[in-house]
From Swiss-Prot:
Membrane topology summary: Peripheral membrane protein
Disulphide bridges: none
Name of encoding gene: atpC
SUPFAM superfamilies: Epsilon subunit of F1F0-ATP synthase N-terminal domain
Record's keyword terms, sorted: ATP synthesis, Cell inner membrane, Cell membrane, CF(1), Hydrogen ion transport, Ion transport, Membrane, Transport
Presence of the UniProt keyword Lyase in the record: no
Family: Belongs to the ATPase epsilon chain family.
InterPro entries the UniProt entry points to: ATP_synth_F1_dsu/esu, ATP_synth_F1_dsu/esu_N, ATPsynth_dsu/esu_N
Organism of this sequence: Rickettsia felis (strain ATCC VR-1525 / URRWXCal2)
Gene3D superfamilies: F0F1 ATP synthase delta/epsilon subunit, N-terminal (2.60.15.10)
General function of this protein: Produces ATP from ADP in the presence of a proton gradient across the membrane.
Taxon lineage: Bacteria, Pseudomonadati, Pseudomonadota, Alphaproteobacteria, Rickettsiales
Assembly and binders: F-type ATPases have 2 components, CF(1) - the catalytic core - and CF(0) - the membrane proton channel. CF(1) has five subunits: alpha(3), beta(3), gamma(1), delta(1), epsilon(1). CF(0) has three main subunits: a, b and c.
Record protein name field: ATP synthase epsilon chain
Recorded superkingdom: Bacteria
Localization terms from the record: Cell inner membrane
Length: 112
């Protein structure tokens, strides 16, 4: 039984993040959800929000990305998150993250 799962955050321009983790949480269209190793396969629509990656333990996220809407493919051994935009916000404060999230939630026609 695997103790970690490979998490990839993929944008049209690059692989923004790729690392083994104990757990990942993300913003699905129906609400936040988490994925642990050996999760049942699924494909889920994402909305703009925070993806939190738990590298060392499942209680404190070590890496946080702000993503635009997209899609996630989950298997028992990996999670692929495909999104237009992925911003590492691990070291930003809550106000900065909230500002960036509001920008991502705007319709494309209004974004700079």
């Amino acid at each position: 039984m695997n103790e970690t799962i490979l998490v990839k955050i993929i944008t049209p321009l690059s692989i923004a993040f790729e690392k083994q983790a104990k757990m990942v949480t993300m913003p699905g269209e129906e609400g936040m959800f988490g994925v642990l190793p050996n999760h049942a396969p699924m494909i889920v629509s994402l909305k703009a929000g925070l993806v939190q990656v738990y590298i060392d333990d499942i209680y404190n996220p070590q890496i946080t990305y702000l993503v635009s809407s997209g899609v996630t493919e989950v298997t028992g051994s990996y999670v692929n998150i495909a999104t237009e935009t992925a911003i590492n916000v691990t070291n930003l404060n809550e106000a900065e993250i909230a500002t960036k999230l509001l920008e991502l939630q705007k319709p494309l026609s209004e974004q700079h």
